[in-house]
Amino acid sequence: MKSLNTLVILTSVISTSVFAGAYVENREAYNLASDQMEFMLRVGYNSDMGAGIMLTNTYTLQRDDELKHGYNEIEGWYPLFKPTDKLTIQPGGLINDKSIGSGGAVYLDVNYKFTPWFNLTVRNRYNHNNYSSTDLNGELDNNDSYEIGNYWNFIITDKFSYTFEPHYFYNINDFNSSNGTKHHWEITNTFRYRINEHWLPYFELRWLDRNVGPYHREQNQIRIGAKYFF
């Protein structure tokens, strides 16, 4: 019974891949196609009722290159509507800033808890860049995209969880993705292990679709990170 109660508690929070309370997070990533590393530092807070906010700062490093700033980002979300104890509708949004310019996104999550050990979140998101880029016709325009994401959350044990996360992107204006088409996929597999009430390390394997130039290969990425809850 104790294990079942723990699973129920974990299920109530794993839908957004977070636990309640303030936390700091560190993550390192390596892209095998570009030979690029990314270092991320994040601070955040998640309330017991599901609302949250987080601040993110990243840096990138490539072989024989200097450490460069990636982006700063602030993101927040709120469980606006909960018609049943299994269904939650949650809007969210973010703004970011990097060397080329700023941008942001708005999204709507719909989460349904099918069982104590499985829940699914479907996310509809619009990504916007405030700066202009040169499109396929040689004109300046905003390289915005529409994104559909799914989060298949599985509670394996009271400590171990797994999330399967496929995302589909479609470019709104006349731009191609790195695979040479107007659309692409990004698929993430996340494995988490809850050591205790403070430490939550995780490991991610990602496929970021094929890059047709300049790398001409599949973009696979490995991430290793940990959260510390206060």
Curated annotation (Swiss-Prot):
Summarizing the function annotation, the protein's role is: Outer membrane channel protein that allows an efficient diffusion of low-molecular-weight solutes such as small sugars and tetraglycine. However, the specific substrate recognized by the OmpL channel is unknown.
Matching entries from SUPFAM superfamilies are given as: Porins
The membrane topology noted for this protein in its Swiss-Prot or TrEMBL record is: Multi-pass membrane protein
Could you tell me what this protein is called?
Porin OmpL
Which is one GO molecular function term here? porin activity
In its keyword annotation, does this UniProt entry include Ion transport? yes
What is an example of a Pfam family matching this protein?
KdgM
Organism field: Salmonella paratyphi A (strain ATCC 9150 / SARB42)
Q: Which gene encodes it?
A: ompL
